[in-house]
A protein has these predicted regions:
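Conserved N-terminal Rossmann-fold NAD(P)-binding element of oxidoreductases
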Residues: 27-29, 52
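Aromatic pocket-lining residues of Rossmann-like dinucleotide-binding sites
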Residues: 41
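Hydrophobic/small residue at the entry helix of a nucleotide-binding pocket
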Residues: 33-34
Length: 223
């Protein structure tokens, strides 16, 4: 057991730590949610991360996106995340894809992955990723944030969770996000991911909803 992972034990067993080092995780989006997810999973020590984002950092990202900084403005988010990743855990293998998720590349991005993490900020992309995971038979960890609130869930093939949550005509009007909201949501997403990868019991098709303004938490079965 490498020294860097010793504080994961006994919360995780040594066998679980070794198991997750064999896993391949896709993270789509390297902004508010994605930056936190990538950092968490690097520190956990998953074996392989494929990180995807075609966007560049802008000034409006500085309030919440972990890998944003003044020097990073104008640079691709996935590329900057990869640079930071090497300083966090160089033992994790990285695939860096400086592209947006599209119908044309979705199945290629999912190839050989054990699970996909939704760190997107738009509904069409979220629906596209969910449909691709359904087709590939790969579980999806969903996360969404707005203002003070966030929600996360593990969706297995056949759940159709994203279709239920986001019909085609769904419109998001509030695009404000506070700095702590993506960190909270990403923590829940990462915990669902790690439990799935290590074979621990985990609820699927259940929304975990957090309201940090009113300190409220709800568990909402959806399937």
């Amino acid at each position: 057991m490498q020294e860097r992972y010793l504080r994961n034990i006994p919360a995780l067993t040594e066998e679980e730590c070794q198991l997750q080092q064999q896993k391949r995780v896709l993270v789509v989006g390297c902004g508010g949610l994605g930056g936190n997810l990538i950092s968490i999973l690097l520190r956990f020590g998953v074996g392989h991360l494929r990180i995807v984002d075609g966007d560049v950092f802008e000034t409006t990202n500085l309030n919440r996106q972990l890998f944003s900084s003044i020097p990073a403005l104008g640079h691709n988010k996935a590329r900057i995340a990869a640079q930071r990743a090497g300083n966090i855990n160089p033992d994790v293998a990285l695939d860096v894809v400086e592209e947006f998720l599209t119908e044309e590349n979705a199945q290629t991005l999912l190839q050989n992955c054990d699970i996909a993490l939704d760190a997107l900020d738009n509904i069409p992309g979220r629906r596209l990723l969910a449909a691709a995971c359904e087709k590939a038979g790969i579980p999806l960890v969903y996360g969404a944030i707005s203002g003070w609130v966030s929600q996360a869930a593990l969706s297995m093939p056949g759940d159709r969770l994203i279709e239920t949550l986001y019909p085609e005509d769904t419109v998001v009007r509030d695009k404000s996000v506070l700095s702590f909201t993506p960190a909270r949501c990403a923590s829940m997403q990462a915990s669902l991911c790690v439990k799935y990868l290590t074979g621990r019991p985990v609820e699927t098709g259940t929304i975990y909803y957090f309201d940090l303004l009113n300190q409220e938490f709800e568990t909402i079965p959806m399937v």
